[in-house]
Amino acid sequence: MPDYGHPLRFATFISPANSPAHRPVELAQLSERLGFDFVTFQDHPYKADFLDTWTLLSWVAARTERIGLAGNVLNLPLRQPPAVLARASASLDLLSGGRTSLGLGAGFFWDAVQAAGGRRLTPMQGVTALSEAIDVIRGIWDADGPGTLYVEGEFYKVRDAERGPAPAHDIPIWIGAQKPKMQDLVGRKADGWLPSLPTMEPGGLPKGNAIIDDAARDAGRDPRDITRLLNILPGQQTAEALAQMTLEDGVSIFILASDDPDMLQRFAAETIPAVRDHVARGRT
């Protein structure tokens, strides 16, 4: 697949561990000082040893100035209802000065989700519920839309809901998608595809891009409008290999999963400049 031409950006993926509670905040602040574009946190609300991700994002927003913020990805079955999630994300965007992105997942670890009070869904139900949730979220954000909001879905029924507030900027919706049905949803409704390289099958990037691009065109969208992100592990790929993923598979945001300050510093000082150099030469 081609390079979609998006600006090259980098992010960190930090565990929201609560012992000590201030540690994820310090790593987020370090990420900002090192020049990363985003800091992201996984979302497992059923884990007692994790901070609540949404509370953490709000606290990090208050303790940083520039860096973008996102869940990676928010567990939709436990972030209910979507209208409230829409207002929460718009509020964070307003308070942070337009730094919020909304990473969403259909749900995983269903035993834990159900134990915490969430509804267990089949894979197809999860896709449908996420699709409906996106409609609700975008409808709430559309503060100048006509009248009140109505969404009559299988999982979410919103009737006569007030719209707003509008976020400070157009919040991108990134979907964590590994399977074809979810990738199809990315192409139809999302602003970004956020898979994880460690769990991806060989050839997963070009295969996923093909599904997303076809779905986007079928929906009357330009595939180039969809950002391609990728979670990566330290040392998993060389700078040359990462640059190749940009030039051949369109990945424009690489997200480093590490809680090691030294690793974050080395990646920022060595890998990021090398990737930028390779991509710049490849794009000329």
Region locations from a protein language model:
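Active-site-adjacent structural elements that line small-molecule/cofactor binding pockets in enzymes
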Residues: 1-284
